[in-house]
C-alpha cells in the first residue's frame, strides 16, 4: 500500500521506519543497515527473491543511514517504571510517550511480557540429548527476541535470580510508528467524534417510567464514552479524535492486540517448518508465559483525601467482581474497555440470559407449588395410597418379587408434583420464552456490536490465523478486501472434515456403549438389591439402581468430556480453518455434538425409551439376556426429574467448586513455587517486586469455551426437559447468580490479563441455542404426549368419569392367564392391553390423540415463534439510524481527497515534491523468511 506523504504531518514522533519482514506480517527494521543486510541475505536464498533484494539495496543506498527506530538504549537507562498506560496521565506519561516515539533516553512502558525460566542446576545434570534441546530452545528464544527488536519493538529484559533458577522477563512495548502502521494493517476502528454514553437496560427504563427506585443500578465511575468511529488510516490521522496525544490515542487493549499480532506472526526459525509465532513457543515450552500486564493491584487503596485514583482493574473489582454486587447491573462498557469485546460479550450474554431466567423461575416455581397443592386433592393418587392390597403388581425385574401398588404411595405423590395440567402450560410458556429470549438477544447483540465498533468484524476486519498463514500452501485474493491472503483449498478441507466426522461418530458410539452399560448396570443392580434379603432395600431396589446409575453416568460424562475436548482440538487444527472465528466455530460444533450425546443420552433414554419395549408378563423383551427396564412405580417422569437434578445440579456444583478451588490452588502453588525459590536465594520477604512478577504469579486465562459450554448445556436442560422438572429454571438462576461473580472474580483477581480479542457476536453458540430451542419444542411435545399422564387423564375425563374415579384401575392391565397359571397367582401391570397381552382399542385411541397433540403443539409454538420473529426486528431502529449517521460522518471525514491532493488525486496517491518521500510501500517489504532463522 502507498501512503500519502502529507499524512505524516500530524505525527509527533520520529521519521517513518523502513519495514523488513513479510507482507503478511508487516514488521520493521531498526535501520537501513539492517534492511541492507536482509536484502543481501535474501539474495543468496532463492532466485525469486533476488529482484526484490537488489531493489532494497538500491533504495537503501539512496537514503541516509540514520537510525529510524533506536531500540538499543544505554544499559544504565534500560531499567525504569513499567506498567500499564492506565496511568499515562501521571508524571510517567511523558516518559511513556517518549518511549513509544522511539527515544532511547526515557524509560518505557511495558505493554506485553514474555517469561521463561532456566534451572541452572538441572542444566548441569542433563544428558546430551536434553542439553541439545535446551540449547535449541535458547537459540529459538534469542532469534525470536532479535526479530522482535528488528520489528521495531522495545525489548527490555529483567532477570530475577531465585537460587538455582533464573526467571527471565522480556518487557515489550511498541513505538508510535509501529502502533500506527498496525492499526491500519489490522483495520482497527478508532474514534472520529465523541457521543454521550447512552447505555441502558430495559428494566431500568421500565422502573423509571413506573417511578420505582431501581435497586439494580450501580453508579460506576469513569464511564467510557461512545464514539462515532471508522477504520484507521494513517494519512487521515489528524481527523481522528485524540490523535494529538500519543499517550492515550491507542488504548491499552488496542496496543495489546497489535503486539499480540506481531508476536503471533514473528518467526523464530524456518517458516516451512512452522517455527513461527508465540503459540508454538508456548506449546514447545520455549516460553513459560506471554501476557499483557494488568493495570495494577485489584485491591482498592484506603479512602481519604490523598487516596489515588482507582485504576481500571480496581474499578471492576469494586463495582463488579465483589459478591456484594450480585444484584447490580454489570458495567459492560468497563469490562469491554479492560478485557476486550469477546469477554464483554460473554458477560453480556450471561447477564442477559440470567435476567430472562427470572420470570421462567417464578412461573416454574408457581407450577411446582400448584403440584404440591394437587397432591392432596388428586383422586387417582388417593386411590393408590388407599388401595392397600387391592392391586398386586407383577415383578419389575427377573428375580424381583410381586409387590403391592400401595407401597409406591410416596413415589406416586412425588410424581404428581411434576405431572399435572400446569406442566402443559409451563412447557408452552418455556417454548415461547426461549424464542423470545433469542429474538431479543439478537437485538441486544446488534446494539452492543455497534456500540463497540465490531458490527462488520468477521466480514472485513478479521485476519487469517497465524498458524493457518504459516501452513497454507498458496495465496488467493480475499473476495471482500481484494488483498492476497494465505489460502487452503476448500476441497482438501472438506476431505479433512469428513475424516474428522468419522472420529466424531466413533466417539458418539463410545457414549452410546457407555449408556448401554449403564442400562445393564441398573438392571443387574436391581436384581442384586432385590436378592439382598433386606425387605426395605428390596422394596426400593428399582429406585436404588436408578439413583446409583445416575451417579455412575455423571462420572462417565465428566471423564469422556476431558478426553474428547483434546481430541476435537487436534482435529480442528488439522482441518486448516482460515480465521480464528471459523476455527472456534468448528471446534465448538465438534465438542457440542459430543457433549450433547454425552449429557443428554441418559435423560433421552429415560424420557422416550425406558418402559416402552418391555413386553408383558410371560413375554418380556431382553437386551443381552437381561430383561428391559420398566419405569418405577411412580412413573418415568419422576425418574427423569431425578436424573435431571443429579446431572444438572451435580454438574453445576462440581463446576462451581472447580472454579473456586482450582484457580486458587494453582495461584497458591505458583506463588509458593516462585517465592520459596526467592527465600532460598536469600531475598527478603518484604522486598518489592515488579508488576510483571506479580502478574506471573497469577493463573493463565483458560478462555471462554468451557464457560459458554456450561451455560449452553444448562439452557438445554432448562428447555428440552422442562416438562419433567419445572424447578430447572430456578436452579439455573441460582447457579448463574453465583456464576457471574465467580467468573468476574477469576478474570479480575486470579487470571493473568488475557489479550483483548474482538468479536461481533457469541458466534456459533447462538445457532446452537436456536437449534436447542427447536429441539425443545419437539421434545416437550413428545414428553407431554407419551411420558406424562396428562393425555390419558384427559381421555378418561372425556370418555368415562370427569372426577377421575376409577382412573387407576383403568391404567392397569391383567397378566395373561398363562403367566398366572405358571405362578399360581394373578397380577397387574401398567399398560393398555387385553387379557391376552394384545394392545387394546384404548391404546390405539390414545396413540392417535398423542400424535395429534404433538403435531398441534409444535405447529402452534413454531407459528407463534415465527410471528414473533417477524414482529421483532433483529436490529433496533435506533441502532440503524446511528449506523447511517456514522457512515455519513466517516464518508465526510475520509473522502476529501480533492482538498488534500488536488482534483485528480486519489486517497492513496502521493503529491510530487513532498517533503517526506514515503518508503512505506509493499516493495520495501521482503519475505518473512528473510528474518533470522
Curated annotation (Swiss-Prot):
Q: What induces it?
A: Up-regulated by androgen.
Q: Which residues lie on this side of the membrane: Extracellular?
A: 377-420, 521-550, 610-714, 785-843
| UniProt region (Disordered), positions on chain | 43-101, 902-933
Q: According to its UniProt record, which reaction does this protein catalyse?
A: a 1,2-diacyl-sn-glycero-3-phospho-L-serine(in) = a 1,2-diacyl-sn-glycero-3-phospho-L-serine(out); a beta-D-galactosyl-(1<->1')-N-acylsphing-4-enine(out) = a beta-D-galactosyl-(1<->1')-N-acylsphing-4-enine(in); a 1,2-diacyl-sn-glycero-3-phosphocholine(in) = a 1,2-diacyl-sn-glycero-3-phosphocholine(out)
What GO CC annotations are associated with the protein?
A: anchoring junction; cytosol; endoplasmic reticulum; plasma membrane
Asked if the Swiss-Prot or TrEMBL record annotates the protein with the keyword Cell membrane, the reply is yes
List the glycosylation sites.
809, 824
Biological process annotations from GO: calcium activated phospholipid scrambling; chloride transmembrane transport; monoatomic ion transmembrane transport
Tissue specificity: Specifically expressed in epithelial cells of the prostate (at protein level).
> Into which family does the record put it?
Belongs to the anoctamin family.
Q: What else is known?
A: The term 'anoctamin' was coined because these channels are anion selective and have eight (OCT) transmembrane segments. There is some dissatisfaction in the field with the Ano nomenclature because it is not certain that all the members of this family are anion channels or have the 8-transmembrane topology.
- Record PANTHER family: ANOCTAMIN, ANOCTAMIN-7
Q: What is this protein called?
A: Anoctamin-7
Q: Which gene encodes it?
A: ANO7
Amino acid at each position: 500500500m502507498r501512503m500519502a506523504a502529507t499524512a505524516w504531518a500530524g505525527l509527533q514522533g520520529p521519521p517513518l521506519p523502513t519495514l523488513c519482514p513479510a507482507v503478511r506480517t508487516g514488521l520493521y527494521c531498526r535501520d537501513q543497515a539492517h534492511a541492507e543486510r536482509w536484502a543481501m541475505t535474501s539474495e543468496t536464498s532463492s532466485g525469486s527473491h533476488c529482484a526484490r533484494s537488489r531493489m532494497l539495496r538500491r533504495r537503501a543506498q539512496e537514503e541516509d543511514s540514520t537510525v529510524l527506530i533506536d531500540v538499543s538504549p544505554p544499559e544504565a537507562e534500560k531499567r525504569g517504571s513499567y506498567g500499564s498506560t492506565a496511568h499515562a496521565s501521571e508524571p510517567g506519561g511523558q516518559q511513556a510517550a517518549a518511549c513509544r516515539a522511539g527515544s532511547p533516553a526515557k524509560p518505557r512502558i511495558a505493554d506485553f511480557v514474555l517469561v521463561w525460566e532456566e534451572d541452572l542446576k538441572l542444566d548441569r545434570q542433563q544428558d546430551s540429548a536434553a542439553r541439545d534441546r535446551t540449547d535449541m530452545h535458547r537459540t529459538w528464544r534469542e532469534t525470536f527476541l532479535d526479530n522482535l527488536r528488528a520489528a521495531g519493538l522495545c525489548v527490555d529484559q529483567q532477570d530475577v535470580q531465585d537460587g538455582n533458577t533464573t526467571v527471565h522477563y522480556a518487557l515489550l512495548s511498541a513505538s508510535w510508528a509501529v502502533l500506527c502502521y498496525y492499526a491500519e494493517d489490522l483495520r482497527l476502528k478508532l474514534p472520529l467524534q465523541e457521543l454521550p454514553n447512552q447505555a441502558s437496560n430495559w428494566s431500568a427504563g421500565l422502573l423509571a417510567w413506573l417511578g420505582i427506585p431501581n435497586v439494580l443500578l450501580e453508579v460506576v465511575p469513569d464511564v467510557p464514552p461512545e464514539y462515532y468511529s471508522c477504520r484507521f488510516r494513517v494519512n487521515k490521522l489528524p481527523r481522528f479524535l485524540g490523535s494529538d496525544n500519543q499517550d492515550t490515542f491507542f488504548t491499552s487493549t488496542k496496543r495489546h492486540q497489535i503486539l499480540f499480532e506481531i508476536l503471533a506472526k514473528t518467526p523464530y526459525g524456518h517458516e516451512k517448518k512452522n517455527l513461527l509465532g508465540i503459540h508454538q513457543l508456548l506449546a514447545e515450552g520455549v516460553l513459560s508465559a506471554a501476557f499483557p500486564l494488568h493495570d495494577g493491584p485489584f485491591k482498592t487503596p484506603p479512602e481519604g483525601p490523598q487516596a489515588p485514583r482507582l485504576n481500571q482493574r480496581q474499578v471492576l473489582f469494586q463495582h463488579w467482581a465483589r459478591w456484594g454486587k450480585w444484584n447490580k447491573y454489570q458495567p459492560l462498557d468497563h469490562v469491554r474497555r479492560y478485557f476486550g469485546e469477546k469477554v464483554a460479550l460473554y458477560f453480556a450474554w450471561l447477564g442477559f440470559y440470567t435476567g430472562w431466567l427470572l420470570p421462567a423461575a417464578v412461573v416454574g416455581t408457581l407450577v411446582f407449588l400448584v403440584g404440591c397443592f394437587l397432591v392432596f386433592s388428586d383422586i387417582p393418587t388417593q386411590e393408590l395410597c388407599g388401595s392397600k392390597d387391592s392391586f398386586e403388581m407383577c415383578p419389575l425385574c427377573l428375580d424381583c418379587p410381586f409387590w403391592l401398588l400401595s407401597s409406591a404411595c410416596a413415589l406416586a405423590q412425588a410424581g404428581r408434583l411434576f405431572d399435572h395440567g400446569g406442566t402443559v402450560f409451563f412447557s408452552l410458556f418455556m417454548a415461547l420464552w426461549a424464542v423470545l429470549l433469542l429474538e431479543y438477544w439478537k437485538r441486544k447483540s446488534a446494539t452492543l456490536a455497534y456500540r463497540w465498533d465490531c458490527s462488520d468484524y468477521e466480514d472485513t476486519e478479521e485476519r487469517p490465523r497465524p498458524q493457518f498463514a504459516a501452513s497454507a500452501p498458496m495465496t488467493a485474493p480475499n473476495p471482500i478486501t481484494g488483498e492476497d491472503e494465505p489460502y487452503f483449498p476448500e476441497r482438501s478441507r472438506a476431505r479433512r472434515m469428513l475424516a474428522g466426522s468419522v472420529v466424531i461418530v466413533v466417539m458418539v458410539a463410545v457414549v452410546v456403549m457407555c449408556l448401554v452399560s449403564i442400562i445393564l448396570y441398573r438392571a443387574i443392580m436391581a436384581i442384586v438389591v432385590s436378592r439382598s434379603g433386606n425387605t426395605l432395600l428390596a422394596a426400593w431396589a428399582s429406585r436404588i439402581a436408578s439413583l446409583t446409575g445416575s451417579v455412575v453416568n455423571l462420572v462417565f460424562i465428566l471423564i469422556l468430556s476431558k478426553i474428547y475436548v483434546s481430541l476435537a482440538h487436534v482435529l480442528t487444527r488439522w482441518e486448516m480453518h482460515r480465521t480464528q472465528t471459523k476455527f472456534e466455530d468448528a471446534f465448538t460444533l465438534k465438542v457440542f455434538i459430543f457433549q450433547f450425546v454425552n449429557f443428554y443420552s441418559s435423560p433421552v433414554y429415560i424420557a422416550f425409551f425406558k418402559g416402552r419395549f418391555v413386553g408383558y408378563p410371560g413375554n418380556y423383551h431382553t437386551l443381552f439376556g437381561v430383561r428391559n427396564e420398566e419405569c418405577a412405580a411412580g412413573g418415568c417422569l419422576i425418574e427423569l426429574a431425578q436424573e435431571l437434578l443429579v446431572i444438572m445440579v451435580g454438574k453445576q456444583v462440581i463446576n462451581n467448586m472447580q472454579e473456586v478451588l482450582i484457580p486458587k490452588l494453582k495461584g497458591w502453588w505458583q506463588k509458593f513455587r516462585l517465592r520459596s525459590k526467592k527465600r532460598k536465594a536469600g531475598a527478603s520477604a518484604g522486598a518489592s517486586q515488579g508488576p510483571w512478577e506479580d502478574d506471573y504469579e497469577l493463573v493463565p486465562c483458560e478462555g471462554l469455551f468451557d464457560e459458554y459450554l456450561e451455560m449452553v448445556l444448562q439452557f438445554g436442560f432448562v428447555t428440552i426437559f422442562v416438562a419433567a422438572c419445572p424447578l430447572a429454571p430456578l436452579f439455573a438462576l441460582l447457579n448463574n447468580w453465583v456464576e457471574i461473580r465467580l467468573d468476574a472474580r477469576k478474570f479480575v483477581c486470579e487470571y493473568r490479563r488475557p489479550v483483548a480479542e474482538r468479536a461481533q457476536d457469541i458466534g456459533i453458540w447462538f445457532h446452537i441455542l436456536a437449534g436447542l430451542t427447536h429441539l425443545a419444542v419437539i421434545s416437550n411435545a413428545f414428553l407431554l404426549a407419551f411420558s406424562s399422564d396428562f393425555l390419558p387423564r384427559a381421555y378418561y375425563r372425556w370418555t368415562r368419569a370427569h372426577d377421575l374415579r376409577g382412573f387407576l384401575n383403568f391404567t392397569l392391565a391383567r397378566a395373561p392367564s398363562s403367566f398366572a397359571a405358571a405362578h399360581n397367582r394373578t397380577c397387574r401391570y401398567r399398560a393398555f392391553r387385553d387379557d391376552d397381552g394384545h394392545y387394546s382399542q384404548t391404546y390405539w385411541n390414545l396413540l392417535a390423540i398423542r400424535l395429534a397433540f404433538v403435531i398441534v403443539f409444535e405447529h402452534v409454538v413454531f407459528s407463534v415463534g415465527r410471528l414473533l420473529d417477524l414482529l421483532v426486528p433483529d436490529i433496533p431502529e435506533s441502532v440503524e439510524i446511528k449506523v447511517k449517521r456514522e457512515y455519513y460522518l466517516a464518508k465526510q471525514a475520509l473522502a476529501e481527497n480533492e482538498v488534500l491532493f488536488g482534483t485528480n488525486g486519489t486517497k492513496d496517491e502521493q503529491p510530487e515534491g513532498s517533503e517526506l518521500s514515503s518508503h512505506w510501500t509493499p516493495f520495501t517489504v521482503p519475505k518473512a523468511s528473510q528474518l533470522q532463522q
